[in-house]
């Protein structure tokens, strides 16, 4: 099981803050700003200006490019109630000093204390605790499989719904 989500920066400047506000996205708060705006800077490396490219590979690997970070993230089980989350950051030998500095700065976006990854880690911990607590039980959530595919936005549950369809097939349900 695997999937790929790619977000490409539009060639025409768009007001993404307005789009988030219009959809009442909880994390969109007026008045908040980064102390270091360069954290979200980007140097174009590929033909398309890709801001996010995330490829989860079941059961425990995620290969991702967020802005200029290149990361392989592994979830390593350490027993029924523990796991280790390992981040491998990459760069290229021929990176310019500016690119290397940007990659190091943007490592603060992802990783164990990253601005983005904190929620992922917390969600994984919640699943781990629930699995240990209710290991002899099972549940079924349809995840709205009948919902139409929505591919014009990344603000969707389509990928996770499709993952669970594939997982059910893999597990013989």
Q: What are the language-model segments listed below?
A:
Residues 1-173:
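C-terminal catalytic domain of Rieske-type non-heme iron oxygenases
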């Amino acid at each position: 099981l695997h999937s790929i989500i790619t977000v490409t920066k539009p060639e025409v400047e768009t007001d993404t803050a307005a789009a988030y506000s219009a959809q009442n996205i909880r994390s969109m708060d007026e008045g908040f700003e980064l102390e270091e705006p360069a954290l979200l800077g980007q140097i174009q490396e590929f033909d398309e200006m890709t801001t996010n490219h995330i490829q989860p590979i079941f059961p425990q690997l995620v290969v991702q490019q967020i802005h200029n970070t290149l990361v392989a993230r592994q979830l390593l089980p350490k027993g029924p109630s523990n796991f280790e989350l390992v981040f491998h950051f990459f760069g290229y030998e021929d990176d310019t000093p500016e690119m290397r500095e940007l990659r190091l700065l943007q490592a603060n976006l992802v990783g164990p204390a990253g601005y983005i990854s904190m929620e992922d880690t917390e969600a994984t911990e919640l699943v781990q605790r629930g699995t240990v607590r209710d290991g002899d039980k099972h549940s079924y959530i349809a995840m709205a499989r009948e919902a139409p595919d929505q591919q014009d936005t990344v603000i969707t549950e389509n990928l996770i719904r499709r993952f669970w369809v594939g997982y059910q097939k893999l597990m013989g349900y």
